[in-house]
């Protein structure tokens, strides 16, 4: 079971809201501030970039069928930032692997840009919790490794690697090896490696989970900047509710046994977001109430 060690302080002037009031406030806020949750470069929200229809996934455990996902239905618009939260074992990472095409054994359908996902594709990039850098390769070599299955010209590869190193703020560390840089910098290399192929969909599986709190906050801000800069459709799997509220346009709350969507919470907050604002804290408290960590009276 996942525990969220976060103190919730709504301030003296903020009265507690019921779930119904919270939902009403979210809807009203979204209506009066339409477009605030998207960046200036992400305005094409008409057609779905990703359509997940009645997806189910089971594993065979000895002679028993283990139902991991059941009845997953989700529509994600181009340029949207979606966060998925839920307790360990609810199938968050499994769902991300299906979207990435790393696992094609499931029921239902997953369509990306109007076509069924039948395997991995360079238009979909993924970043895992572990940076998975090769210790014998430098920063630039680790990023350039993404081109190994492409026929992109050598000069174009070099230009793209240089650009991504600059975008993630690693100038001066091109020749450094993984053991010579911090964990946060290593994760930036992993993100740059995912972005260097210019994907349209970025999948993030707990990318900051192993980092210290301060580095995590810094990289959350960095990820927000990259999302706005690149205009990517982004799906983030996380256990950190505050991280989800800080980054996402919508939060998918999942429950377990089998993994399914409990509800979807909109986050109608302008960017950059103020973590101390009353509405930010109310949304966070409401989502955390799903995990019995905070009571919303």
Segment roles from a protein language model:
Residues 176-179, 197:
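Conserved signature/switch motifs of ABC ATPase nucleotide-binding domains
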Residues 65, 120, 140, 166, ...:
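Signature (C-motif/LSGGQ) region and adjacent switch/coupling loops
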Residues 108-120:
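Conserved ABC transporter NBD signature motif
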Residues 100:
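Helix-to-loop junction immediately C-terminal to a conserved catalytic motif
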Residues 85-87:
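The feature captures the beta-strand-to-loop junction immediately N-terminal to the Walker
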Residues 127, 191:
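Hydrophobic anchor residue at the start of the ABC signature
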Residues 137-144:
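Short coil-to-helix segment of the ABC ATPase nucleotide-binding domain corresponding to the Q-loop/switch region
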Residues 144, 153-173, 225:
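Conserved ABC ATPase "signature" region
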């Amino acid at each position: 079971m996942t525990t969220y060690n976060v103190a919730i302080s709504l301030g003296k002037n903020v009265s507690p809201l019921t779930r119904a009031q919270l939902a009403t406030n979210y809807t009203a806020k979204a209506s009066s501030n339409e477009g605030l949750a998207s960046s200036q470069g992400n305005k094409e929200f008409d057609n779905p970039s990703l359509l997940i229809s009645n997806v189910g996934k089971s594993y065979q455990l000895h002679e028993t069928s283990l139902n991991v996902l059941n009845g997953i239905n989700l529509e994600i618009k181009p340029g949207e930032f979606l966060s998925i939260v839920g307790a360990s074992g609810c199938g968050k990472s499994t769902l991300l692997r299906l979207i990435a095409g790393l696992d094609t054994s499931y029921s239902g359908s997953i369509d990306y840009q109007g076509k069924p996902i039948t395997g991995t594709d360079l238009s979909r990039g993924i970043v895992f919790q572990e940076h998975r850098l090769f210790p014998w390769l430098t920063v630039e070599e680790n990023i350039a490794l993404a081109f190994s299955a492409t026929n992109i010209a050598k000069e174009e590869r070099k230009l793209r690697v240089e650009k991504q190193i600059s975008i993630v703020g690693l100038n001066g560390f091109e020749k450094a090896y993984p053991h010579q840089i911090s964990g946060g910098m290593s994760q930036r290399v992993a993100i740059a490696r995912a972005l260097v192929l210019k994907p349209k969909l970025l999948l993030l599986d707990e990318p900051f989970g192993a980092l210290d709190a301060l580095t995590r906050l810094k990289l959350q801000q960095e990820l927000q900047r990259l999302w706005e800069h690149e205009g990517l459709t982004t799906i983030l799997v996380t256990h950190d509710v505050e991280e989800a509220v800080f980054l996402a346009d919508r939060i998918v709350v999942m429950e377990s046994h089998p993994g399914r969507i409990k509800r979807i919470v909109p986050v109608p907050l302008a960017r950059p977001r103020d973590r101390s604002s009353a509405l930010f804290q109310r949304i966070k408290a409401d989502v955390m109430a799903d995990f019995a960590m905070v009571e919303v009276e």
